[in-house]
Amino acid sequence: MLNYKKWTQPPNSLIKSIKASRAAYRRLGNSGLLVSNPILGGMHIGDPRWYDWVLDEKDSIALLKAAYDRGINTWDTANIYSNGESERIMGRALRSHNIPRSKVVIMTKCFRAVTDPDVDGDIGSSTAFFPDLTRQSKDYVNHCGLSRASVFQQVEASLRRLNTDYIDVLHIHRFDHHVPPEETMKALHDLVQMNKVRYLGASSMWAHEFAILQHTAEKNNWTKFVSMQNHYNLLYREEEREMIKYCNLTGVGLIPWGPLAAGKLARPPDGKASTFRAINGGAYKDHNPAESEQIARRVHQIAVSRGVPMSHVALAWLNKRVVSPVIGLSSVERMDEVLDARALELSDEEESRLEDPYKAQPPQGHS
């Protein structure tokens, strides 16, 4: 007869593991997959020759190990980050620290072209950001976009760089206007059936484009997207008009990028930016700088009154509305700061103060 009293207390090893897990874990949309909050953004992982704010391999691997040790088990990257070096370093981090593959959720993306080192040896090359030109090149045709040929080629290349058999969540980086939705969604579905990809997601596009792709998958009984990685923070809320409503209604998990607006929501408005990326405000133009400064000042005021960093206030507002933000971290100190943000809850009055100055602006980042 079994002695069930033996199992009335959890083992010490489990308690120890929970104490070390400083991240929270949340369901990704209607899927059963749990992802960490926060998600570690991989754009900072790679080679500083691509952008000056990117960490080199040694510092990148140290950061990834620190993330794993703290329970940040979800790592987001893309094939184009540091022209593939971000993916390679993530794979090396797993091997060098003997991290079991099954204990990390790896997200990557396909759509843009990765610079071919046999064509251009400069890792800082920006081939990815000229999609119309890459379609005219003998070296890049069928190596970008979302055709069946391109999707398969890009995923196989990512698997080699990551040195893994599967990708946990594959995001399409943008919508492809040159390829029928049926071709893209069938290719993605087949990758899932082949167990090379386990879940599908999408990033930054118009809500109607995302709905078209989801409907295409649904009517054909193909794999649907479980996540949307869109641009969303206190300074850019245009996604609230359509995309966020659609995702919430249909069970798609929101994992936004740029949660701290390239650092604008993490330092006082009069503070000095420390990187080229922060100095130039990130990838997109701020159409309402006066309103953005007012919001940032209010974030700072609430942070001072609460005795916490500004990032805690910005993330407390966002975490209430999404599954998990994708955050690019440049140091272990910043990582610990972000992890400590879990404890803060804003009052309704504080949230209203943060939201009131916002002014509508043209949508950005969908192409």
From Swiss-Prot:
GO MF term (any one): oxidoreductase activity
Miscellaneous remark of the record: Gene clusters encoding host-selective toxins (HSTs) are localized on conditionally dispensable chromosomes (CDCs), also called supernumerary chromosomes, where they are present in multiple copies. The CDCs are not essential for saprophytic growth but controls host-selective pathogenicity.
Functional summary from the UniProt entry: Aldo-keto reductase; part of the gene clusters that mediate the biosynthesis of AM-toxins, host-selective toxins (HSTs) causing Alternaria blotch on apple, a worldwide distributed disease. AM-toxins are cyclic depsipeptides containing the 3 residues 2-hydroxy-isovaleric acid (2-HIV), dehydroalanine, L-alanine which are common for all 3 AM-toxins I to III. The fourth precursor is L-alpha-amino-methoxyphenyl-valeric acid (L-Amv) for AM-toxin I, L-alpha-amino-phenyl-valeric acid (L-Apv) for AM-toxin II, and L-alpha-amino-hydroxyphenyl-valeric acid (L-Ahv) for AM-toxin III.
Pfam families: Aldo_ket_red (PF00248)
Induction, per UniProt: Expression is up-regulated more than 10 fold in toxin producing cultures.
Annotated gene: AMT2
Pathway the protein acts in: Mycotoxin biosynthesis
Location of the active site: Y81
Positions contributing to substrate binding: H173
Keywords (A to Z) from UniProt: NADP, Oxidoreductase, Virulence
EC number: 1.1.1.-
Record-listed NADP(+) binding positions: 76, 203-204, 229, 258-268, 330-338
Family: Belongs to the aldo/keto reductase family.
PANTHER family registered for this protein in UniProt: NADH-SPECIFIC METHYLGLYOXAL REDUCTASE-RELATED (PTHR43364), OXIDOREDUCTASE (PTHR43364:SF9)
Protein name in the entry: Aldo-keto reductase AMT2
Enzyme class, spelled out: oxidoreductase
Annotated stretches, region: Disordered: 346-367
